[in-house]
Structures are given as C-alpha cells and as structure tokens.
Design a protein with these regions (language model features):
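Ligand-binding clefts of soluble mixed alpha/beta catalytic domains
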Residues: 1-532
C-alpha cells in the first residue's frame, strides 16, 4: 500500500484565502441551483399542487429506492439564457428496485413543461449517458410539447429524442414512460415508443392532435378523454400497458416494472472501500483563487481515492503530469492530473503510454484538469511538441475505456482536448466552481489580439492608438473571463454539472457504479498512427 503523504498546511494564510474564495463561489452556485429547484416559482408550484399533482422532484423521490442518492445531471442547463435555469427538465441517475436507472422528469410548473432548445440538449445528453452506460430509462412525462416560439431550433433536431428511445430498446436497454398529464403532438411518441407505458385515470392525455386540432382538420367533435385519455388507451387503443388510479399508484407500478426487468450489471459491485486518510473538507483550500499559481494535484488525489493509496507511473519523468493507479469506492481507476499547468513533450508521451496501459487492463481513466495547454516557443516546436501533443490527443480520442473528467482549475487550449474535454466524449464531466475553460486565458487572448492589431497598423504605416488598445484589451478580457466561468459553460451543457469539491468522491463513485453496468473493455491496438 502506497499512501500519499500530505504537505497541505491547513493553518497557512494561503489555505485560508483559497478556502474563502471557493466558499464564496459555492454560495453563488447554491443560489443558481436554488433557481432550478424552485421550478416555475411558488405561484405555479402551488397551482400544480392545487390540482392534486406532485412536483416533478417529489415524483422522483417516490420513484427511487428509500435512502439512496439521486445524481442530478445538468441542473444549470439554460443558465444565462432567456429560459428558466434547469430548462424545465430534471435528469439524473437513481436506483429503482436495486437497478441504476437514467431518470428524466418534465417540470410542468415551468411553462407547462414545454421543451425549449436547452431542454432538448439536456434530454439528448441524458440519452447519451443511458446508451453509453446501458442504464434503463424512466421518463416521467408531463409536457405540452415544444415551446412553439422556438420551434425552429427544436423541431428538426428534436426527432433524435424518439430515435434514441427506439435505439435504446433495440440495444436491449429497457425504457419506461409514466404519463402524469399531457403528452401531446410529438410528445405522444415518448410513451408510444417506450417498452412500457403507464397512464393515470383522468390525468394522462396522450394524442397526436387535441380536440381543437381534430375539429379544425376533420370537423370531428371530440373530448380529451375519448381522444387520448388513459382509460381509452388502456381499453381501446392498447397504448397503455398499465392503468393507474393516481400518481402514487403509477409510480408504484413503474417500480414493479423495473423489478421484473431481470436486469444484471456487467460487473459485480465491489465490496466496502476504505475512505481516504485525509478530510475531504480540506479540498476547499487546495486550488488557489489565482489559477496562475500552481498546486499539487496529489493533495486532491489523496482526498479522493480509497485509503489515499496511489501508485505513481513514471513519477520522475514528465513531472508536470501526475499519472498512476488507485481505487475509488472499490473501482480501479487510472488517474491523469496536471501538476504545473503546461504540458511538454515528455508529459504527452507519458500520457499516451499510460492511456494505452489502461486500455490493456480495461481500467477507466480519471482526468483532473488544471492546464494552460501545450508549451509554445522555438525550442519546443523544434523538439516536436506538435507531434507529441498529437500523440496524447490520439490516445485520448481512440481509448475505449470509460473516461471521467473533473475541471479543478484551468482547462485551456488544446490541453483541454488532451485531458479529455467535452468533445472527446468522457462518460461524465464535472467542474468545480474554481475552474475556467476557454481557448486561452483572458489576458493572453486579449494580448494576442493587441499584438495582431499593432502589427497590422505598423504594416499599413499608421499610428497605433494605445488608448483604444487598452480599452479593447479590457473589454476582451472581461468578455472571455465571463465566458470561461463554470456556470456559463454548464448552462450550455459543456459539463454534466458544477459540483462542490467535497462531493467529488461521492459523485465519481456513483458514476463509476453506473459505468460498470456496461462492459468495460479497452482498445486492443485500435489507435491511430503515432508520430514518433
């Protein structure tokens, strides 16, 4: 057993300053999460309850097994847009009758649960997670369909939702739809394409066209119940597989459906795991408020992995990247963590070899980001930084073992790609409130624009306006700073959530458990050409 030592001084001024800065960011984060939790606000929640209906989150609470956690995904979707934070949809992973399931629930207190462009992106991301990890899907449906004013952004890509349901079923991944209210127009295909559909007496309304549309199109007089009521679908159309008397009964029946899946995980759950030797609360004081100041990621690893036990790989080579093996909640993981921000040729080659080893051993990889990117300059260009960086990115792109990414600090430039950023399809990607991500840092980007503008003026023989340049740089820095912050990026679904660092071990443990529902198999020689 190789227990990581700690050099973290929790009594130092630096630790206190780091902790205070992160706690301030967590306070801001909690305020934004509260908006998602509030749904449509007190008025609309009260109206919903007044109709005898449960809020979406209470439906989920009844669905999942008692005293089991629910890992909510993308809670800040639509942050910074014209739509409500959360995008009128709740998604996450919960345990139902002992089975880990991907659960989605429309929030009818937000514009009747209507889908906007961010709702669609959030739902599609949930489907990706379900498919990659072979998680059965349960949809708690109550939606008026598409938000019509934004239909141009929803209609064409929105067809992928129904495609996904059928592909999940074809892959042998069960799908269940529980209809609590309206499921109209395109939304009618959610229960229609799911393996199992549960409907509620005098509540569920499932039809392609409601009475007004039918009247306009055919002249036929009809009402909700005869056209798409639960009893009609249970007795006449056959669309309803299960007929419930109320919401609680519908959820009970959904749980019984899952209990009869005869579902088995590809890998057995590991036994009890030893907790880290160090207090997870200390994670709050590790990342500096100024991301230009480096920190030792081993202090983070020591507070995440089982028993703080970590076997380093090539510890004396490419020291700006820490690599090694550990267990997290009993699951084996290979870890890559930035130590000094910049990636050089040595780090790139080290990473590529380590990723290949993980694929040989069928071990998932955890990437802990704090990088400004790959090194630039004449010496490094001549030394092959491009081909070595490409080697690392090649290895990440063609690796077949599951990847998990956590943005702790900076995640800039091609370093974001090499550390398995969103475009490289990590199974899950989370950010700490201390993180930032962009093509480069705000000051660097503003400086590059300034140099280019100055050179352009000189080439034309024109005087350069230094005052205007200072104003431009300040404006660009402010813009890039705002656009690199985690809430901005999370609002655009560039991560699966911004998390409290103290929750990281629990979140990663839940993700690893979900990942092991599906087979974990590495690439066997399936990498592209490595330039040597």
């Amino acid at each position: 057993m190789t227990v990581l030592p700690t050099g973290l001084d929790t009594n130092s001024p630096e630790y206190a300053a780091n902790r205070a800065a992160l706690l301030e960011k967590l306070t801001e984060l909690e305020a934004e999460h509260a908006k998602a939790l509030a749904g449509g606000g007190e008025k609309y929640v009260a109206r919903h309850r007044g109709r005898g209906k449960l809020p979406a989150r209470e439906r989920i609470e009844l669905l999942v097994d008692p005293d089991t956690p629910f890992l909510e995904l993308s809670p800040l979707a639509a942050w910074g847009s014209d739509y409500a934070v959360g995008a009128s949809l709740i998604t996450g992973i919960g345990v139902v009758e002992g089975v880990e399931c991907l659960i989605t629930a429309n929030d009818p207190t937000v514009r009747g649960g209507a889908s906007n462009p961010w709702t669609l992106k959030k739902a599609l991301r949930a489907n990706e997670i379900a498919f990659a990890n072979r998680l059965p899907c349960i949809s708690l449906v109550e939606s008026g369909g598409a938000d019509l004013p934004s239909q141009k952004e929803i209609f064409i890509p929105g067809g992928a939702l129904f495609r996904d349901i059928t592909r999940l079923s074809a892959a042998g991944i069960p799908t269940v739809a529980v209809v609590f209210g309206n499921s109209t127009a395109g939304g009618a295909y959610v229960p229609g394409m799911s393996d199992h559909a549960v409907m509620i007496r005098e509540r569920s309304k499932v039809f392609l066209g409601g009475p007004p549309l039918v009247k306009m199109a055919t002249g036929e007089e009809s009402d909700d119940e005869s056209l798409g009521g639960a009893e009609m679908h249970a007795r006449t159309s056959g669309l309803a597989d299960h007929f419930a008397v109320d919401e609680q009964d519908a959820i009970r029946q959904a749980r019984r459906i899952v209990a009869r899946f005869n579902w088995r995980k590809a890998h057995a759950d590991p036994g009890p795991a030893e907790p880290p030797k160090y207090d997870e609360d200390e994670l709050l004081g590790i990342v500096p408020g100024d991301l230009k100041v480096p920190f030792d990621p081993r202090e983070v690893i020591a507070r995440l992995v089982d028993g703080s036990d970590f076997d380093a790989f090539k510890p004396l080579y490419g020291t700006s990247l820490v690599t090694g093996w550990a267990r997290l909640h009993g699951y084996p993981v290979g870890i890559l963590a930035n130590a000094q921000g910049v990636l050089f040729s040595e780090e790139s080659q080290k990473a590529a070899q380590f990723i290949q080893l993980a694929n040989q051993r069928d071990i998932p990889l955890l990437f802990l980001h704090n990088t400004t990117g790959y090194m630039v300059g004449k010496e490094y260009e001549q030394g092959g930084i491009i081909k070595h960086g490409a080697m690392m990115i090649n290895a990440v792109a063609n690796s077949k073992v599951p990847h998990l990414s956590v943005l702790m600090g900076a995640s800039y430039g091609a370093g974001h790609y090499g550390m398995c950023g969103r475009a490289y399809d990590p199974r899950f990607l989370f950010a700490w409130p201390s993180s930032k991500s962009a093509v480069m840092g705000p000051q660097q980007l503003a400086g590059v624009l300034s140099v280019v503008a100055r050179a352009s003026s000189a080439a034309k023989g024109l005087p350069y306006d230094d005052e205007a340049d200072a104003g431009l740089r300040a404006m660009v820095e402010q813009q890039i700073e705002a656009e690199s912050l985690p809430m901005f990026l999370s609002g655009r679904l560039y991560d699966d959530g911004v998390i409290d660092p103290r929750d990281t071990r629990t979140v990663l443990g839940m993700c690893l458990s979900a990942i092991h529902t599906a087979p974990v198999e590495g690439a066997r020689g399936g990498f592209g050409v490595f330039r040597m």
